[in-house]
Amino acid sequence: GGVAGASGLALSADGETLYVSDLGSRCIWAVPSGGRERMAGGKGCAQLAAGLPGYPGALAVEEDGTVSVGYRWARSAWLEDHADGALLRGAALRLSESMQERLFQMPEDGICAERFGPDGALLASYGGKALGGVIALCPAENRVYLGVAGETKIQWVRI
């Protein structure tokens, strides 16, 4: 196992679990933080969430173990149909920003952020073109604040 494009890291409140967002595999790994080798897909780790609707980046973990993830780009059916594996998808996500815009632009109804329970259950999805591609996020009380690519104003959604 391994990660084809780690793009976000977040540590659980107890310090025992490191969450890793994987661009190439469109998943979130839960990796034991105390291990000698911290490899997603390796011994003792598990997928918290897989088959995500976009390419995950920003991660945040709340005290209760809820994991929030922001999607920088929408899933590209063309790329995934033509890429032989997660490594090539990870490489494509490192293209120039203008090329990425053309390949992965967020659709009007695209999901740009989600929240998962500690067990991996989907708790909520947030979307819409107005929100765009999320590059940073921060849950606080009854909101999730979102840093959106190309925007000067911080967006937020109610939890």
Please give the residue ranges for each predicted region.
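Loop/turn-rich, solvent-exposed surfaces of beta-rich toroidal or solenoidal domains
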Residues: 53-127
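Structural signal for beta-propeller blades
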Residues: 26-28, 75-77, 113, 152-155
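Conserved beta-strand positions in repeat-built beta-propeller and related beta-rich domains
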Residues: 2, 11-12, 18-25, 68-73, ...
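Blade-edge beta-strand/turn elements of extracellular beta-propeller
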Residues: 1-8, 29-52, 118-129
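Blade-level signature of beta-propeller repeat domains, shared across WD40, Kelch, NHL, RCC1
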Residues: 68, 134-159
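Short, solvent-exposed loop/turn segments that connect beta-strands within catalytic domains
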Residues: 16-17, 36-42, 139, 146-147
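A short, polar/proline- and glycine-enriched secondary-structure boundary/capping micro-motif
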Residues: 9-10, 30-32, 41, 79-81, ...
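Beta-rich, blade/repeat-based domains predominating
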Residues: 1-17, 51-64, 109-112, 129-142
